[in-house]
Amino acid sequence: MNLHEYQGKQLFAEYGLPVSRGVAIDTPEAAAEACDRIGGDCWVAKVQVHAGGRGKAGGVKLVKSREEAKVFAVNWLGKRLVTYQTDASGQPVGKILVEACTEIERELYLGAVVDRSSRRIVFMASTEGGVNIEQVAHETPEKILKASIDPLVGAQPFQARDLAFRLGLEGDQLKQFTHIFIGLAKLFQEHDLALVEVNPLVVQKDGNLLCLDAKINLDTNALFRQPRLRAMHDPSQDDPREVHAAKWELNYVALEGNIGCMVNGAGLAMGTMDIVNLHGGRPANFLDVGGGATKERVTEAFKIILSDAKVKAVLVNIFGGIVRCDMIAEGIIGAVREVGVKVPVVVRLEGNNAELGAEMLARSGLNIIPASTLTDAAVQVVKAAEDNP
């Protein structure tokens, strides 16, 4: 679960981390009032969405009057922001963060994630702040500095000082960076976070450090013991198809292609998407119905896939182990009849009761295309999508 920037900064402030004075608003009038409350003669207005790239998409603006802040709010509230991290429809804008301006000397990066290989929280820092850190890691990995946190003793000041020296900080900045580092580590552990990022962590003209941005991702599995953070969830930022899928314990991620995929097992689902791509197709989604698939869940999976208007064909790839292929076939038949599927459906069944499942599909009288192998299935579904403009 993601938090908005303004929510992340509220948490930062509670842990004593330096953040800009700001106000989250949801009306144009409140935007003008926020400028008065903050004071000064210039402010930064930032739309609040769960996506990066806001600045390049016009969602961040320096405003120099109350009226300019109000106009920015009028232009964005209730609209959708499209960035390189969103789909073509973008994310809805329900709030805008108005902040005091900051005079920036340098931009750094500081973040932490759970490293699955070491099973520890790992902090990452870089002199390349304010840019896409994944790009920095790919192009200049030597610029990514790391510190692994021992779960028995927690984050240590010496680790912070080591990173600070290597970032080129000096004097009182070392103490400030250590305070931020220890505070983020404490925040991470006490709130069951999966990721926290300060990008950029800036050195101001006066030499002091400031957390200019806040990105927080919570471990969804731990939300039951974080009721306060759970209440911060903004459902407007969720894809309604993914919300629907979660209710049926389906793992669904929307993509940009036109071939719907329904598979049991995450590994097989990724392999299916790869082979569809290999044969010139573009998957419209990742959908894992899981090992405990039922007729009802298969029906709901079809509804979710077909709610995407871009889908021109559907590939069902099932390996029967725990789940029986005949039960999946029954679900497919019921779903096609109930939903009224209008696009070609290619089905490949293998494993437990696969032959029985194939017979049921053949006897159904429905326009379902059988496939004998995964390659055959990929070739057929790509052709079907191309033939269905």
Curated annotation (Swiss-Prot):
Cofactors required: Mg(2+)
GO MF: ATP binding; magnesium ion binding; succinate-CoA ligase (ADP-forming) activity; succinate-CoA ligase (GDP-forming) activity
Residues that coordinate or bind ATP: K46, G53, R54, G55, E99, T102, E107
Keywords recorded for this protein, A-Z: ATP-binding, Ligase, Magnesium, Metal-binding, Nucleotide-binding, Tricarboxylic acid cycle
Ranges where the ATP-grasp domain occurs: 9-244
Residues that coordinate or bind Mg(2+): N199, D213
One Gene Ontology cellular component annotation held by this UniProt entry: cytosol
Matches recorded under Pfam families: ATP-grasp_2, Ligase_CoA
Enzyme nomenclature, EC number: 6.2.1.5
Metabolic or biological pathway: Carbohydrate metabolism; tricarboxylic acid cycle; succinate from succinyl-CoA (ligase route): step 1/1
Superkingdom of source: Bacteria
Signal peptide annotation: none
Substrates-to-products reaction catalysed: succinate + ATP + CoA = succinyl-CoA + ADP + phosphate; GTP + succinate + CoA = succinyl-CoA + GDP + phosphate
Function: Succinyl-CoA synthetase functions in the citric acid cycle (TCA), coupling the hydrolysis of succinyl-CoA to the synthesis of either ATP or GTP and thus represents the only step of substrate-level phosphorylation in the TCA. The beta subunit provides nucleotide specificity of the enzyme and binds the substrate succinate, while the binding sites for coenzyme A and phosphate are found in the alpha subunit.
Subunit structure: Heterotetramer of two alpha and two beta subunits.
Family: Belongs to the succinate/malate CoA ligase beta subunit family.
Protein's UniProt name: Succinate--CoA ligase [ADP-forming] subunit beta
Organism: Azotobacter vinelandii (strain DJ / ATCC BAA-1303)
Gene that specifies this protein: sucC
